[in-house]
């Protein structure tokens, strides 16, 4: 069947909210490692998808799912070793106090549950998030996703702190006497203002929820000390700190397993999602025994599919592959190689205003004017990402202006893969400049 025919069938059968990437939609039929293949046999280098974190259709993950599916799939009201083992293995990846898990199916569910836990345990209702954030699409979590709707429609229990954007934000790198520490303090002041605003409206904070990569904002690297200050402010007001690791977790940033580890702060609650199952839908909330016990006294939480043995088998296989194949080290080493290559691209192409990220997560901020840092028009950015796709490399866009090229490949991404991707981006930007 042709791509056009399938697209027409899709248009009739699926709701219009389902968007397709790229000007010419890609009809994918197979994946292997860092490669995706379309219906005509053409292969694409995947520089976008972090759900298949250990590579598309990794044999260990596929076999784990198939083996367990042949035996049994049920829920957490029965004993099963896979589920217990997954909780133990995850707990071992965190500081000792973060040792208790709830299992769900998606990052949205995990953020929803984390918010419920914070509200139940603290007895407070207010929430603090970053301006321009995205955390999921349930009714509750969508309200926490300030990128998704106008500020005038926000509930009065929500405070949106200024996102720590050191490139285009109100406080920029090199602009503050006192350097990075002063910059961190400035952005943390916005959190304090948010907490004060909640108090004026009759709320105390239950928690501050932060995406440790600020992905939807455009991949920000906050000034050192910001996150610890922000968490301290919220805790002093009686709230908890929730780290949303759906994007940043599972070795994505190259130096650590979790994004928050880069900023010297231990969360009260951690949310896991996308990469956890290597392509299988599984997510989790991790917290302390004390918080778990306090929540359990109030709410008997159960999730029909969360923590099923098949999902647990997939998630255990992902942990095995990351450790045995040295994918944290690979993300670090290839990330350093990418960093150098992206810096060279930025030197050659005035359209690149900034390059941000680490490990295997990079944002290439496209601008129409470097001096003013004016974001490139969203439509033009879409044309560029579609041109890159036509050359066989899949990337995405992010940021509030839709102008930041998102580079977020599976963890087995190699130096050769990186060089190929950089060559394609370079060629497309050269063609644009002609």
Sequence positions of predicted segments:
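Conserved N-terminal phosphate-binding loop of PLP-dependent enzymes in the Aspartate aminotransferase
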Residues: 1-434
């Amino acid at each position: 069947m042709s791509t056009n025919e399938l697209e027409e069938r899709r248009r009739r059968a699926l709701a219009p909210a389902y968007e397709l990437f790229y000007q010419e939609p890609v009809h994918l039929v197979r994946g292997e490692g860092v490669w995706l293949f379309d219906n005509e046999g053409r292969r694409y280098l995947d520089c976008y998808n972090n759900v298949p974190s250990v590579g598309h259709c990794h044999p260990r993950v596929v076999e784990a799912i198939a083996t367990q599916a042949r035996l049994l799939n049920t829920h957490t009201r029965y004993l099963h070793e896979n589920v217990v083992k997954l909780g133990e293995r995850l707990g071992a990846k965190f500081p000792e106090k973060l040792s208790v898990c709830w299992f769900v199916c998606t990052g949205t569910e995990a953020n929803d549950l984390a918010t419920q836990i914070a509200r139940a345990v603290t007895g407070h209702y207010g929430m603090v998030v970053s301006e321009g954030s995205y955390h999921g699409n349930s009714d509750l979590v969508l309200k926490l996703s300030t990128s998704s709707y106008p500020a005038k429609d926000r509930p009065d229990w929500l405070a949106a702190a200024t996102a720590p954007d050191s490139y285009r934000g109100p406080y920029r790198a090199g602009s503050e006497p006192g350097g990075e520490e002063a910059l961190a303090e400035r952005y943390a002041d916005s959190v304090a203002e948010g907490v004060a605003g909640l108090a004026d409206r009759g709320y105390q904070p239950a928690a501050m929820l932060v995406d440790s990569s600020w992905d939807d904002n455009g991949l920000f690297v906050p000034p050192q000390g910001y996150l610890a200050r922000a968490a301290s402010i919220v805790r002093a007001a009686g709230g908890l700190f929730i780290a949303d690791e759906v994007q940043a977790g599972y070795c994505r940033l190259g130096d650590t397993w979790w994004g928050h580890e880069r900023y010297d702060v231990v969360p009260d609650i951690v949310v896991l999602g996308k990469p956890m199952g290597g392509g299988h839908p599984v997510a989790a909330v991790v917290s302390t025994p004390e918080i778990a016990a306090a929540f359990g006294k109030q709410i008997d939480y159960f999730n029909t599919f969360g923590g099923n043995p098949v999902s647990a088998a997939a998630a255990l296989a992902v942990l095995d592959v990351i450790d045995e194949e040295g994918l944290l080290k690979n993300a670090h080493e290839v990330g350093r190689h990418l960093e150098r290559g992206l810096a060279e691209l930025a030197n050659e192409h005035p359209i690149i205003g900034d390059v941000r990220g680490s490990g295997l997560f990079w944002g290439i901020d496209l601008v129409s004017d470097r001096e003013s840092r004016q974001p490139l028009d969203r439509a033009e950015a879409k044309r560029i990402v579609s041109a890159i796709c036509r050359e066989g490399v899949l990337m995405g866009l992010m940021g509030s202006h839709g102008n930041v090229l998102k580079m977020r490949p599976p963890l087995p991404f190699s130096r050769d893969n990186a060089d190929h991707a950089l060559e394609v981006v370079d060629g497309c930007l050269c063609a644009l400049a002609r």
